Amino acid sequence: MARGLVSSLLLGQLLLVLVGLFSPAGAVPTPQYQTPNTQASSYWLSSIKRQGIAPFNGGGAGYKVFRNVKDFGAKGDGSSDDTAAINMAISSGSRCGKGCDSSTTTPALVYFPPGTYVVSKPIIQYYYTQIVGDALNMPVIKAAPSFEGIAVIDSDPYENDGSNWYTNQNNFFRGIRNLVIDLTGLDKSKGACIHWQVAQASSLQNIRFEMVKGGGDANKQIGIFMDNGSGGFMTDLVFNGGNYGAFFGNQQFTTRNLTFNNCNTAIFMNWNWAWTFKSLSVNDCGVALNMSNGGFNQTVGSVMILDSKIKNTPKGVVTSFNAESVPESGGTLILDNVDFTGSTDAVTSLQGSSIVGGGSVIKHWVQGNAWTAGSGSKAKRLPPQVQAKPDVARRDDCPAPAPQPPAQSTAPPYPIPETGEPTRVPTTEPSNVPTRVPTGGVPSGTTGTAPSTPSPSPTGGPTACPSAPVTKARVQTALPQPSKPAILLDKSGKVFERAKPQYENVSADKFLSVKSAGAKGDGKTDDTKAIQAVLDKATADQIVYFDHGAYLITSTIKVPKNIKITGEIWPMLMATGKAFSDMKNPIPMLQVGQPGDKGNVELSELIVTTQGSAPGCILVEWNVAEETQGSVGMWDVHFRVGGFAGTQLQSNTCAKTPNTTTTPDPKCFGAFMLLHITKTASAYLENTWLWVSDHELDLADHGQINIYNGRGALIESSGAVWMYGTASEHNTLYNYQIQNAKNVYMALIQTETPYYQSNPDALVPFAPDTKYNDPTFGDCTTAACKKAWGLRILNSTDVFLFGGGLYSFFENYKQECLKTESCQLNMIEVLCSETYLYGVSTKASTNMITSGGKGLVPQKENRSNFCSTIALFHQGNL
């Protein structure tokens, strides 16, 4: 949710993009797909009994959580203008629109039956909205020839003064899936399918973007236009045609299984801090990914491309990274198992020269600062670069700007930017001016184990292993590919992945509603027994369904080892009561399987949280191991503690206290731990956000708050753990801890240190517990040392991280520490472990990585556009 620096160069690129979105219409091409029929669907979501309520809404039983757009007058006949009806379906019920910023009390699940829905203005997706099409017969949303607006679906509208409805990096809890969005009725000179300016707990899934094919530079159509935000996850998307399949800019993001066909440029990366692409497929495009924005002064922090294939596309990746580019670690690029046999050049400079030729599979290629035991002897080095110190980044700044106030026009009130020349406009076809690429080894960086400030050795974990020294090299080279354990790989040799289940072929009568079984979900009634009864009686062919509501749980729910559970737009499971009050004897709210179990567990579309203080609660204890690969997992399940209605942990009770020496109020304690993946378990996690709230979502002040939550995610599994698009924020002792584990794959992770630390520090109010191998901070001598670890890896093997953003923005809500990038001392601990960490970005931590009590990787030698970034950390030889 952080923000960074404003760049006029980025602004110029955004202005040109927006001009394209609002260009006048011209000749209309014919559609490029078959129009779906409008018959009734057998998809369960369209016919299941609707009993969901918004328990903290205050509007009573009349508030509708589920909305079918046809109930609001939409025709879906391919000719009627359905704009007003669709927007009414979304907005009705005094929901969170312009001027609201955020609210959890007005959720809406908006369903599109099969059909073709013509729109002439943007569909505005209000906060806490899921737009869901029929999964069996995907509906089409088609832009009329007269369409005017920023995009067919707009997640964060702009006003004429350039302001947004929602704060981009706090634009949480929204999703779109199962749609075809069609721009082929527009002239090729304008149009975007989705304006996706979002933050955590957001997703796009199973969407096809239809745009005009060909047209050269005159084609300005875009599938996804993303200007900024703090995401996020998207998966299973297909982009056909257009200029840019996707125009991306965000702090951090994870994408999986994106396919681009016949785009001028598949992906234009405008800016980021960290972005992971898994399973890209690019076919018949001009450029697969252009990350060269900014030229010499790079705007892209880091990109990971994994298990991907580029076919019949001349240019794979266009980069501006070279011997002279700044910042030093800007433009970090990792290629891991990427098939460029269909490309002339795999990696190309902005000026057009080939860096890596195409025609083969690149097993492993690294661009950026590598810290390894073998860097000095094996890596092709580039010299380090020195740049002027940038302006101090502030929390209330943003690294990718909104467009400037637009000029008045005859179009609806969406921004049409004033014309203006940007500093530099990236092109899809770089010029032929050669770039200087060094041919010899040039010394860069340092070798050793001690930066300016030593870090303490952990006393809650193993200390016998000596700290292996690492050497820094600024590289642009192929490296040996680390061997990944077979347990993590699918049959084709790629890292395993699995889409969120939608149960398309399950009939509605196979869903067991917890409300029909007696649970109330009203945020007042103890629903423990009713929920347990439903779980106990569910059979293998049934799915337990949580209608939207707030379900109070007062003792441990035992989740069987073979079960499927899904919810209606994130129903809340809330731990409360005396059973969860003892932090010295914590118990789980949801105990998923028993130690030693093997089975098939699927959890999706849920919120797990507390009502009031629950310092003796582990929200989810995950014990079950997979029976078949990936058969146990969580998709779109979010851990959200405090900061919203019904939690009793809000800004009116737990406001921040930076001006006094703080003794934590027991009424503002959260949970003992959010997620524990135990020793015998395995798990597949996708789009899972573990968030201890830093600010209020529902009360009008949206003020910052102090919620004290002991620990984030503890992973001890010796099975397989996959984590795609996960984040863990604002936990007191640590956000992620991996100990005595193996076979852990993370792509990507994001963390934030609690804003209130070090008032109090990490040792308050949750004392380190030896049973859980907590950090003790016993050797710390400064306040900056006693802050939450972003990630600890202890006594573990085969741990892979492809992309990480681990941030520290405050010292007791003040930001003077950003001037020296020293808000805390240490962020990542690696001890007695075999790890491969790629694309790691940290903010304002003096030491990025420590081991055995010594700082190995200092942030000051790895400056990027906003964070400090390294391409690779590995303590062994490559």
Swiss-Prot record:
Residues glycosylated per entry: N228, N257, N290, N297, N505, N659, N795, N862
Name recorded for this polypeptide: Probable glucan endo-1,3-beta-glucosidase ARB_02077
Family: Belongs to the glycosyl hydrolase 55 family.
Annotated function: Probable glucan endo-1,3-beta-glucosidase involved in the hydrolysis of fungal cell wall. Classified as a small-oligosaccharide-producing type based its the end products: glucose, laminaribiose or laminaritetraose.
Region (Disordered): 373-472
Coiled coil ranges: none
Localization: Secreted
Keyword Lyase: no
Entry superkingdom: Eukaryota
GO terms of molecular function: glucan endo-1,3-beta-D-glucosidase activity; polygalacturonase activity
